[in-house]
């Protein structure tokens, strides 16, 4: 391999024989020697160890030193790319150990080997530094990504803990029950329910079940209808009592609601003391029924067109007593 490349001992000696004589202590000769000629006792090691020697400057710049001539063999084998490569490697490596300084004095073929394409290869220390910088950058990216992922996981965990704590602290929200659809009763069902309600305002469990079975309804539907109907009946009754109290027809009021009966407090408060006393202390026996209905008699008399007023009705058996006058 050394003979084929032209950098062996024989080739270097043959080039030295063909070149003009150089001074004995010339630093250029000491720099261009092979590592086989170098020894720890040689004085040329001082030339290799000094970074500012003129021989090194001549080799690195590729120009002959003033006062000395370079051989034609060396000029044919030395290229600017080969000479600049050791300088670049030496500038990149900042170590000042003896081992590193002696490594800079290796042969020219080892300093800048030719690539397959004919171009000089990139210096090895620079490539190592670039690869190391890329690896450091990747490590930093991985660390930052892991830190970001851990931070996001920690934030998600904190939000979950806050939601759990807030749900524990806050009272449970009661969901509204879905409103049931109203039952559509038929005319026949409504008529039967109204008849049953006229007979009795409150149904027993057995009567309610029988009525529901006869009308093809559920027990709950019949119960709900009766509750709504009783509410409507009480409201209408309260309005009728107020109208009768305003008109002063206490006898009709007694016929509608025989004693004992629980009258609303609002109705009793609007009545005079005598009427209120009569409502609570009236006769327990029901009053006798009228001999003739009142409304049809008035209507028939109005239809006849008689100018004379209708004859007076016979007096009722139960007459409202007058309030006792204070003496």
Swiss-Prot record:
Start-end of Low complexity biased regions: 33-54, 316-327
Compositional bias ranges of the Basic and acidic residues kind: 133-143, 152-166
Keyword presence, Transcription: yes
Keywords annotated in UniProt: DNA-binding, Homeobox, Nucleus, Transcription, Transcription regulation
Biological process annotations from GO: midbrain development; negative regulation of outer hair cell apoptotic process; neuron migration; outer hair cell apoptotic process; regulation of transcription by RNA polymerase II; sensory perception of sound
Stretches the record annotates as Disordered: 1-90, 112-184, 305-327
InterPro entries per record: HD, HD_metazoa, Homeobox_CS, Homeobox_TF, Homeodomain-like_sf
Known DNA-binding region: 178-237
UniProt-listed Pfam families: Homeodomain
Chief localisation class: nucleus
Family statement drawn from the similarity comment of this UniProt entry: Belongs to the BAR homeobox family.
Name of the protein: BarH-like 1 homeobox protein
Gene assigned in the entry: BARHL1
